[in-house]
Protein backbone atom coordinates (compact mmCIF):
# COMPACT_ATOMS: atom_id res chain seq x y z
CA UNK A 1 0.00 0.00 0.00
CA UNK A 2 1.47 3.33 -1.09
CA UNK A 3 0.32 6.93 -0.82
CA UNK A 4 2.18 8.56 -3.68
CA UNK A 5 2.09 12.24 -4.47
CA UNK A 6 3.51 14.24 -7.39
CA UNK A 7 3.04 18.01 -7.59
CA UNK A 8 4.58 20.21 -10.26
CA UNK A 9 4.07 23.92 -10.94
CA UNK A 10 5.58 25.99 -13.75
CA UNK A 11 5.83 29.78 -14.00
CA UNK A 12 7.26 31.97 -16.73
CA UNK A 13 9.91 34.59 -15.93
CA UNK A 14 11.09 36.42 -19.03
CA UNK A 15 12.54 33.84 -21.40
CA UNK A 16 12.86 31.12 -18.78
CA UNK A 17 10.52 28.71 -17.04
CA UNK A 18 10.77 28.13 -13.31
CA UNK A 19 9.69 24.77 -11.92
CA UNK A 20 8.55 23.92 -8.40
CA UNK A 21 8.18 20.21 -7.76
CA UNK A 22 7.38 17.85 -4.92
CA UNK A 23 7.07 14.08 -4.94
CA UNK A 24 6.35 11.38 -2.41
CA UNK A 25 7.36 7.77 -3.04
CA UNK A 26 6.76 5.83 -5.11
CA UNK A 27 5.99 8.68 -7.54
CA UNK A 28 9.01 10.65 -8.73
CA UNK A 29 9.72 13.59 -11.04
CA UNK A 30 12.76 13.54 -13.31
CA UNK A 31 13.36 16.77 -15.24
CA UNK A 32 15.56 17.71 -18.17
CA UNK A 33 16.74 21.21 -19.16
CA UNK A 34 15.41 23.06 -22.16
CA UNK A 35 12.56 25.26 -23.27
CA UNK A 36 9.94 24.04 -22.87
CA UNK A 37 11.04 21.83 -19.95
CA UNK A 38 10.39 18.10 -20.19
CA UNK A 39 9.59 16.17 -17.00
CA UNK A 40 9.17 12.42 -16.60
CA UNK A 41 6.68 11.05 -14.10
CA UNK A 42 8.20 7.83 -12.77
CA UNK A 43 7.05 4.96 -10.58
CA UNK A 44 9.88 2.50 -9.83
CA UNK A 45 7.39 -0.07 -8.51
CA UNK A 46 6.64 -1.13 -12.08
CA UNK A 47 2.99 -0.25 -11.79
CA UNK A 48 0.23 0.52 -9.30
CA UNK A 49 -0.35 -1.99 -6.52
CA UNK A 50 -3.49 -2.99 -4.66
CA UNK A 51 -4.17 -0.48 -1.89
CA UNK A 52 -2.29 2.36 -3.61
CA UNK A 53 -3.71 5.87 -3.43
CA UNK A 54 -1.93 8.42 -5.59
CA UNK A 55 -2.42 12.13 -6.18
CA UNK A 56 -0.98 14.09 -9.11
CA UNK A 57 -1.27 17.88 -9.43
CA UNK A 58 0.05 20.02 -12.28
CA UNK A 59 -0.29 23.79 -12.53
CA UNK A 60 0.98 26.12 -15.24
CA UNK A 61 1.20 29.88 -14.82
CA UNK A 62 0.49 32.45 -17.58
CA UNK A 63 2.60 31.94 -20.68
CA UNK A 64 4.44 28.88 -19.37
CA UNK A 65 4.90 25.65 -21.32
CA UNK A 66 5.67 22.12 -20.15
CA UNK A 67 5.81 18.59 -21.50
CA UNK A 68 5.25 15.56 -19.26
CA UNK A 69 6.28 12.08 -20.29
CA UNK A 70 6.25 8.60 -18.84
CA UNK A 71 8.87 5.87 -19.15
CA UNK A 72 6.58 2.99 -19.97
CA UNK A 73 3.11 1.53 -19.70
CA UNK A 74 1.30 1.79 -16.35
CA UNK A 75 0.49 -1.70 -15.12
CA UNK A 76 -2.39 -2.21 -12.71
CA UNK A 77 -1.95 -5.07 -10.26
CA UNK A 78 -4.71 -6.94 -8.36
CA UNK A 79 -6.67 -5.04 -5.73
CA UNK A 80 -8.31 -1.65 -5.30
CA UNK A 81 -6.24 1.27 -6.66
CA UNK A 82 -7.25 4.92 -6.52
CA UNK A 83 -5.67 7.83 -8.36
CA UNK A 84 -6.63 11.50 -8.49
CA UNK A 85 -5.26 13.88 -11.12
CA UNK A 86 -5.72 17.67 -11.15
CA UNK A 87 -4.48 19.99 -13.91
CA UNK A 88 -4.84 23.78 -13.97
CA UNK A 89 -3.73 25.89 -16.95
CA UNK A 90 -3.51 29.70 -16.82
CA UNK A 91 -3.95 31.98 -19.88
CA UNK A 92 -1.64 31.26 -22.87
CA UNK A 93 0.01 28.30 -21.11
CA UNK A 94 0.65 24.99 -22.87
CA UNK A 95 0.83 21.43 -21.52
CA UNK A 96 1.58 18.29 -23.54
CA UNK A 97 0.98 15.06 -21.63
CA UNK A 98 0.66 11.84 -23.63
CA UNK A 99 1.14 9.01 -21.08
CA UNK A 100 1.99 5.48 -22.14
CA UNK A 101 -0.94 3.02 -22.18
CA UNK A 102 -2.59 1.74 -19.00
CA UNK A 103 -2.65 -2.06 -18.69
CA UNK A 104 -5.19 -3.46 -16.18
CA UNK A 105 -4.13 -6.93 -15.06
CA UNK A 106 -6.33 -9.73 -13.79
CA UNK A 107 -8.09 -8.78 -10.57
CA UNK A 108 -7.30 -5.05 -10.81
CA UNK A 109 -9.90 -2.55 -9.57
CA UNK A 110 -8.76 0.88 -10.78
CA UNK A 111 -10.67 4.06 -9.97
CA UNK A 112 -9.34 7.34 -11.33
CA UNK A 113 -10.61 10.92 -11.32
CA UNK A 114 -9.11 13.48 -13.69
CA UNK A 115 -10.09 17.15 -13.28
CA UNK A 116 -8.79 19.76 -15.71
CA UNK A 117 -9.27 23.53 -15.52
CA UNK A 118 -8.06 25.68 -18.39
CA UNK A 119 -8.36 29.20 -19.67
CA UNK A 120 -9.71 29.33 -23.26
CA UNK A 121 -6.37 30.78 -24.43
CA UNK A 122 -4.41 27.86 -22.93
CA UNK A 123 -3.53 24.70 -24.83
CA UNK A 124 -3.66 21.12 -23.60
CA UNK A 125 -2.75 17.91 -25.42
CA UNK A 126 -3.69 15.01 -23.13
CA UNK A 127 -4.29 11.34 -23.86
CA UNK A 128 -5.76 8.28 -22.20
CA UNK A 129 -4.96 4.89 -23.72
CA UNK A 130 -6.21 1.55 -22.40
CA UNK A 131 -5.78 -2.14 -23.14
CA UNK A 132 -7.96 -5.16 -22.40
CA UNK A 133 -5.23 -6.64 -20.21
CA UNK A 134 -1.74 -8.11 -20.43
CA UNK A 135 -2.04 -9.04 -24.08
CA UNK A 136 1.51 -10.40 -24.36
CA UNK A 137 0.51 -13.02 -21.76
CA UNK A 138 -2.69 -13.80 -23.67
CA UNK A 139 -4.73 -12.17 -20.88
CA UNK A 140 -7.90 -10.39 -22.02
CA UNK A 141 -10.73 -8.75 -20.06
CA UNK A 142 -9.72 -10.31 -16.74
CA UNK A 143 -9.56 -7.10 -14.69
CA UNK A 144 -12.25 -6.68 -12.05
CA UNK A 145 -13.22 -3.03 -12.49
CA UNK A 146 -12.07 0.03 -14.44
CA UNK A 147 -13.62 3.41 -13.55
CA UNK A 148 -12.27 6.62 -15.05
CA UNK A 149 -14.00 10.00 -14.70
CA UNK A 150 -12.68 12.93 -16.75
CA UNK A 151 -13.96 16.48 -16.24
CA UNK A 152 -12.80 19.56 -18.13
CA UNK A 153 -13.72 23.02 -16.84
CA UNK A 154 -13.30 26.28 -18.76
CA UNK A 155 -12.29 28.93 -16.23
CA UNK A 156 -12.68 32.34 -17.94
CA UNK A 157 -15.03 34.19 -20.24
CA UNK A 158 -18.12 32.57 -18.71
CA UNK A 159 -20.31 35.50 -17.60
CA UNK A 160 -23.36 33.29 -17.15
CA UNK A 161 -21.63 31.14 -14.51
CA UNK A 162 -21.55 32.39 -10.90
CA UNK A 163 -18.35 30.40 -10.35
CA UNK A 164 -16.60 31.96 -13.34
CA UNK A 165 -16.23 28.57 -14.97
CA UNK A 166 -18.34 25.97 -16.72
CA UNK A 167 -18.18 22.22 -17.22
CA UNK A 168 -17.03 21.86 -20.82
CA UNK A 169 -16.56 18.09 -21.04
CA UNK A 170 -17.38 15.09 -18.88
CA UNK A 171 -16.66 11.47 -19.73
CA UNK A 172 -17.00 8.37 -17.60
CA UNK A 173 -15.74 4.83 -18.17
CA UNK A 174 -17.19 2.20 -15.84
CA UNK A 175 -16.31 -1.37 -16.84
CA UNK A 176 -17.08 -4.42 -14.70
CA UNK A 177 -16.04 -8.05 -15.11
CA UNK A 178 -16.88 -10.05 -17.28
CA UNK A 179 -16.96 -7.07 -19.70
CA UNK A 180 -19.45 -8.52 -22.16
CA UNK A 181 -20.84 -5.11 -23.15
CA UNK A 182 -17.58 -3.35 -24.02
CA UNK A 183 -16.35 -6.33 -26.04
CA UNK A 184 -19.61 -6.52 -28.01
CA UNK A 185 -19.49 -5.88 -31.75
CA UNK A 186 -21.31 -2.54 -31.34
CA UNK A 187 -18.62 -1.18 -28.96
CA UNK A 188 -15.02 -2.42 -29.35
CA UNK A 189 -15.70 -5.70 -31.06
CA UNK A 190 -12.43 -7.55 -31.65
CA UNK A 191 -10.29 -4.49 -30.83
CA UNK A 192 -8.33 -4.89 -27.60
CA UNK A 193 -6.90 -1.37 -27.28
CA UNK A 194 -8.55 2.03 -27.35
CA UNK A 195 -7.63 5.62 -26.61
CA UNK A 196 -8.64 9.27 -26.74
CA UNK A 197 -6.49 12.29 -27.55
CA UNK A 198 -7.88 15.56 -26.15
CA UNK A 199 -6.65 18.70 -27.92
CA UNK A 200 -8.21 21.48 -25.91
CA UNK A 201 -7.86 25.23 -26.27
CA UNK A 202 -6.09 27.42 -28.78
CA UNK A 203 -4.51 24.79 -31.06
CA UNK A 204 -4.36 25.07 -34.85
CA UNK A 205 -6.51 22.53 -36.65
CA UNK A 206 -4.58 19.24 -36.67
CA UNK A 207 -3.76 16.98 -39.59
CA UNK A 208 -4.73 13.42 -38.73
CA UNK A 209 -2.50 10.58 -39.83
CA UNK A 210 -3.80 7.21 -41.03
CA UNK A 211 -2.25 4.42 -38.98
CA UNK A 212 -1.77 0.92 -40.36
CA UNK A 213 -0.93 -1.99 -38.05
CA UNK A 214 0.12 -5.26 -39.69
CA UNK A 215 -1.30 -3.97 -42.96
CA UNK A 216 -4.70 -3.09 -41.47
CA UNK A 217 -5.94 0.46 -40.97
CA UNK A 218 -6.55 1.35 -37.31
CA UNK A 219 -10.03 2.98 -37.15
CA UNK A 220 -10.43 6.44 -35.64
CA UNK A 221 -13.16 9.02 -35.12
CA UNK A 222 -12.88 12.78 -34.74
CA UNK A 223 -15.10 15.04 -32.63
CA UNK A 224 -14.82 18.83 -32.96
CA UNK A 225 -16.00 21.20 -30.25
CA UNK A 226 -18.91 23.45 -31.28
CA UNK A 227 -18.22 25.76 -28.31
CA UNK A 228 -17.24 29.29 -29.46
CA UNK A 229 -15.47 29.98 -26.16
CA UNK A 230 -13.18 26.96 -25.96
CA UNK A 231 -12.04 25.24 -29.13
CA UNK A 232 -10.98 21.64 -29.22
CA UNK A 233 -10.81 18.29 -30.94
CA UNK A 234 -11.09 14.76 -29.58
CA UNK A 235 -9.57 11.87 -31.51
CA UNK A 236 -10.81 8.36 -30.67
CA UNK A 237 -8.83 5.40 -31.93
CA UNK A 238 -8.99 1.62 -31.55
CA UNK A 239 -6.68 -1.14 -32.68
CA UNK A 240 -4.70 -4.26 -31.74
CA UNK A 241 -1.62 -2.43 -30.38
CA UNK A 242 -1.77 0.28 -27.71
CA UNK A 243 1.82 1.31 -28.46
CA UNK A 244 0.85 2.26 -32.03
CA UNK A 245 -2.02 4.43 -30.75
CA UNK A 246 0.34 6.10 -28.26
CA UNK A 247 2.90 6.88 -30.97
CA UNK A 248 0.21 8.29 -33.25
CA UNK A 249 -1.09 10.60 -30.52
CA UNK A 250 2.44 11.73 -29.72
CA UNK A 251 3.17 12.55 -33.35
CA UNK A 252 0.01 14.65 -33.62
CA UNK A 253 0.85 16.57 -30.43
CA UNK A 254 4.42 17.17 -31.62
CA UNK A 255 3.18 18.46 -34.97
CA UNK A 256 0.84 20.95 -33.28
CA UNK A 257 3.48 22.17 -30.82
CA UNK A 258 5.87 22.84 -33.70
CA UNK A 259 3.14 24.71 -35.56
CA UNK A 260 2.75 26.95 -32.50
CA UNK A 261 6.43 27.82 -32.60
CA UNK A 262 7.60 25.48 -29.86
CA UNK A 263 10.60 23.18 -30.11
CA UNK A 264 9.69 20.05 -28.14
CA UNK A 265 11.96 17.02 -28.22
CA UNK A 266 11.11 14.41 -30.84
CA UNK A 267 8.70 11.61 -30.10
Curated annotation (Swiss-Prot):
Localization annotation: Cytoplasm
Gene Ontology MF terms in the entry: nickel cation binding
InterPro entries: UreD (IPR002669)
Keyword annotations of the record: Chaperone, Cytoplasm, Nickel insertion
Entry annotated with the keyword Cytoplasm: yes
Origin superkingdom: Bacteria
Pfam families, A to Z: UreD (PF01774)
Keyword set includes Chaperone: yes
Main subcellular localisation: cytoplasm
Cystine bridges: none
GO-annotated cellular components: cytoplasm
Subunit structure: UreD, UreF and UreG form a complex that acts as a GTP-hydrolysis-dependent molecular chaperone, activating the urease apoprotein by helping to assemble the nickel containing metallocenter of UreC. The UreE protein probably delivers the nickel.
Function: Required for maturation of urease via the functional incorporation of the urease nickel metallocenter.
Sequence similarity: Belongs to the UreD family.
Protein name: Urease accessory protein UreD
Species the sequence originates in: Synechococcus sp. (strain JA-2-3B'a(2-13))
Amino acid sequence: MNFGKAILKATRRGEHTRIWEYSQAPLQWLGSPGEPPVYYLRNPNGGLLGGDRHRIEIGLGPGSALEIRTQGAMRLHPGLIRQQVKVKLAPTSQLIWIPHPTIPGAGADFRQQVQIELDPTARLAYAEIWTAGRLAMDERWQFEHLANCLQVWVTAGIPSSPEGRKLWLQEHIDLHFPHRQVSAASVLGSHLCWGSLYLLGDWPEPTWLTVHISGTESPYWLVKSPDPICKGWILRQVGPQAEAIWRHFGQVALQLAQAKGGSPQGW
